Amino acid sequence: MTEANMRRAVFLDRDGVINRSDMREGKPFAPLRVEEFDILPGVAEAVAALKDAGFLVIVTTNQKDVGLGLASMEVLEAMHDKLRAEVAVDDICVCICGDHCRRYKPNPGMLLDAAREWDVNLAVSIMVGDRWRDVDAGKAAGCLTYFIDCGYTESLNQTPDHTVSDLPEAVRHILKTLSV
């Protein structure tokens, strides 16, 4: 497929962007139980607006706790069933490995694999996340980056293209500034 015929996507991190993170000592952690998996306000509407504008919406999430045995694959799948039921995402890409894996953010592997699978042009696509790993993965994949500043104690390695307070604000900015 030629670049002109390829699709545009918005890649979304999961924890802290779509659902509430468990905060400990200024750092975000993924929920470990389905009952802790709460979709943030305005997320379903924001994703619907992106889809109405013609974007694919693909979740890219590191879930190292599953790989370490701290959370189960069954719980992760139940969370993603809940996510799919409440938010109209096109795909959910998961890496349970850890830093050594090419798919584990900040490495761009999940974005590159999804782009291949969905015929996505990364040069006109966007990564939205709440951590330095998301910004770095988006930059490495050649995407525009939006950083959701949740006030975490960790710093960024690279400067995001845009900084916003939540996903609905990011989507308003994307739809206002990018021709679709």
Segments (PLM) and residue ranges:
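Active-site neighborhood of HAD-like aspartate-dependent phosphohydrolases
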Residues: 2-58
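Conserved protein kinase catalytic core
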Residues: 19-21, 26, 68, 136, ...
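Short loop/turn and capping residues at structural boundaries
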Residues: 22, 61, 93-95, 126, ...
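Short, surface-exposed alpha-helical recognition segments that flank or form part
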Residues: 34-38, 71, 102
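Substrate-recognition element of Asp-dependent hydrolases with the DxDx(T/V) motif
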Residues: 43-80, 89-98, 138
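Asp-based, Mg2+/Mn2+-dependent phosphohydrolase catalytic module
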Residues: 2-8, 73-91, 100-127, 131-180
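Short, solvent-exposed loop/turn segments at secondary-structure junctions
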Residues: 17, 64-65, 133
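A short acidic, helix-capping loop that chelates divalent metal ions and anchors anionic groups
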Residues: 27-30, 65-69, 98-102, 154-157
